[in-house]
């Protein structure tokens, strides 16, 4: 098996990125699809496309995808409140476990929204329960690498008219991080016209329309306990090959 990674940028600003895990006979087909994805991105034609191919030498981990749930909302304010409620419910468990002040949960969620609304990060921001940024490079964030979904899951997702290719990418990321030590994730797309975002917890992957307005930036934030072994977890989300089914 091989890992393919595509990164595209324009004038040094991130435009598009994607990852796949492939058998040898599918490399050319997948490489072409990744390049096409970069060239025709709605945020602009990139001036740089990097495509990296690596043979996978370690054992692949197979993970069952977290449940996909699509919620209904007609405006950004309602969507933000929905996402806050999901995050608050999950974070309360860990604030209680760690003896943290419940009054600071909303401050933590506010910090996450500030990060995703700023946008233009290649990777994700990581926040502990005190709102501290834990990435080594806060401009780039951390990347979840060496991931893909099974062909069966891809087909299942695309058979649902409400779901898209973006759902495939997102469910792979969310499932991996929640199985490797993170508490929750919130994400909005860096595609300007795509306003569906999501919150992911172990209870599910909650798709929320209008989590941002069209034309706005997007971003991704992971939440983690203060006591977590950050170096080990970062190593796993980057290097452990995972296929989500």
From Swiss-Prot:
| InterPro entries from the UniProt entry | BioW
The record's annotation in Pfam families points to:
BioW (PF03744)
Q: What class of enzyme is it?
A: ligase
Q: Does the keyword Ribonucleoprotein apply?
A: no
Q: Which cofactor does it need?
A: Mg(2+)
Pathway named in the protein's UniProt entry: Metabolic intermediate metabolism; pimeloyl-CoA biosynthesis; pimeloyl-CoA from pimelate: step 1/1
Q: Which reaction does it catalyse?
A: heptanedioate + ATP + CoA = 6-carboxyhexanoyl-CoA + AMP + diphosphate
Q: Which GO biological-process labels does this protein carry? A: biotin biosynthetic process
UniProt keyword annotations, A-Z: ATP-binding, Biotin biosynthesis, Ligase, Magnesium, Nucleotide-binding
Do the record's keywords include Nucleus? no
Enzyme Commission number, as recorded: 6.2.1.14
Question: Its Gene Ontology molecular function terms?
Answer: 6-carboxyhexanoate-CoA ligase activity; ATP binding; magnesium ion binding
Q: Which domain of life is it from?
A: Archaea
Q: What does this protein do?
A: Catalyzes the transformation of pimelate into pimeloyl-CoA with concomitant hydrolysis of ATP to AMP.
Assembly description: Homodimer.
The family classification in the record reads: Belongs to the BioW family.
- Record's protein name: 6-carboxyhexanoate--CoA ligase
The organism of origin for this protein: Methanococcus vannielii (strain ATCC 35089 / DSM 1224 / JCM 13029 / OCM 148 / SB)
The gene behind this protein is bioW
